[in-house]
Amino acid sequence: MREEEKKTSQVKKLQQFFRKRWVFPAIYLVSAAVILTAVLWYQSVSNDEVKDQLADNGGNSAYDNNDDAVEVGKSMENVAMPVVDSENVSVVKKFYETDAAKEEKEAALVTYNNTYSLSKGIDLAEKDGKDFDVSASLSGTVVKAEKDPVLGYVVEVEHADGLSTVYQSLSEVSVEQGDKVKQNQVIGKSGKNLYSEDSGNHVHFEIRKDGVAMNPLNFMDKPVSSIEKAATQETEESIQQSSEKKDGSTEKGTEEKSGEKKDDSTDKSGSKESSTTEDTEQS
């Protein structure tokens, strides 16, 4: 009986305890404090692990990895005329296009040492024949800056993805091999050369993609990506033309062989008829 009375008394005390207004709020606060402490502890441990990993990687995060970084500014450049003052400069010799009119083809020929050559770029000159500042058409690295006895001073600037620009017939240069140049930066002055004397005081400008000359006038004020697209298109067209020529040659050869077989069978048939006729006459 006493044990039952003790249990009953304990239950009543608990009931009285929980009936107090501050009990449940206190329980909630304690629970929240425990949960918050656990969360903060977990975050602290996670941050320590991340710091350890960064320390192992030399302190570099994924955003610090510049190996795959894209030079957005350069890729967004448009091809510019290689002159500081383009208003007073005009094209005096164009790029030789195989599908151009006869007159345009003749005008795009270069005569040197009694030999005709195809113009692989454009010649730019001022109307009054004076020299002018030549600037970089695109940003890049100077891979060549030297004097040629026939072409004058030559500067070649290398860009990304097999693209390069060439500047010839310069009277002087203001850059050296290995220099980094920005678009529209002055790299030299126009001049005269022996290779294209009829162009007078000029600069010869070329755009090359993987060593192949492209018509600069097709890309002026257009993004660099347009050169890549044009080069890809030309390659595809060249492959298609080669394939068509190959198919045409195969068909022609097949027709010739078929004709030979037909002629041979005709000859054999004629021989048989002739033999039959002779046998009949002898009879």
UniProtKB/Swiss-Prot annotation:
Domain of life: Bacteria
Known partners and oligomeric status: Interacts with SpoIIIAH and SpoIIE.
Region ranges (Disordered): 228-283
InterPro entries found in the cross-reference section: Cell_wall_metabolism_enzyme, Dup_hybrid_motif, Peptidase_M23
Regions that span the bilayer: 22-42
Location of this chain's protein in the cell: Forespore membrane
Keyword Membrane attached: yes
Any one GO biological process: sporulation resulting in formation of a cellular spore
GO cellular component: endospore-forming forespore; membrane
Compositional bias per record (Basic and acidic residues), positions renumbered to this chain: 243-271
Pfam families in the cross-refs: Peptidase_M23
Single GO term (MF): metalloendopeptidase activity
Name by which UniProt lists this protein: Stage II sporulation protein Q
UniProt keyword terms in alphabetical order: Membrane, Sporulation, Transmembrane, Transmembrane helix
Bilayer disposition of the protein: Single-pass membrane protein
Protein purpose: Involved in forespore engulfment and required for anchoring membrane proteins on the forespore side of the septal membrane. Forms a channel with SpoIIIAH that is open on the forespore end and closed (or gated) on the mother cell end. This allows sigma-E-directed gene expression in the mother-cell compartment of the sporangium to trigger the activation of sigma-G forespore-specific gene expression by a pathway of intercellular signaling.
